[in-house]
Amino acid sequence: MKLQLWTIGKTNDAYLKEGCAQYTKRLPHYLPFEYLEIPEPKNTKLSSDVLKKEEEKLIFDRLQDSDQLILLDEKGNEFTSTEFGQYIQKKMNSVAGNLIFLIGGPYGFSDAVYKRANGKIALSKMTFSHQMVRLFALEQLYRACTIIKGEKYHH
């Protein structure tokens, strides 16, 4: 089982790239981890629905049947950091394939991606850019791992 964070498109801002790189380096200390930036569709003049369908193809091309797909979605379940750690621990103990957290593009996900998903989580009731959410998600994944291991990172 590998824990993965997938995103649509590259991280643009240097400060976000640096923060993401820090947590991407730290996470493999706890478990097999992969951070994957799926290239966004080339034609940016597409309607939001067509763009979501194009992103869907890119996601499904990489997804295996045994993978657990968890969407980061504003309508998802909210957790405290401790609850999120317990959620990950439970998934790691029960998932045969990879545990994949997916951050969509600026317009969210297609209906087919929602149907394929095994769950949805929200990081907050607030709205964040899909660029910033990457760093927040990586930090929370790292925090969850330290909670699972009983380390002092989380107070």
From Swiss-Prot:
Subunit-level organization: Homodimer.
Name of this chain's protein: Ribosomal RNA large subunit methyltransferase H
Organism, scientific name: Cytophaga hutchinsonii (strain ATCC 33406 / DSM 1761 / CIP 103989 / NBRC 15051 / NCIMB 9469 / D465)
Main location: cytoplasm
GO molecular function: rRNA (pseudouridine-N3-)-methyltransferase activity
Localisation per UniProt entry: Cytoplasm
Keyword set includes Nuclease: no
Role description: Specifically methylates the pseudouridine at position 1915 (m3Psi1915) in 23S rRNA.
Catalytic activity field: pseudouridine(1915) in 23S rRNA + S-adenosyl-L-methionine = N(3)-methylpseudouridine(1915) in 23S rRNA + S-adenosyl-L-homocysteine + H(+)
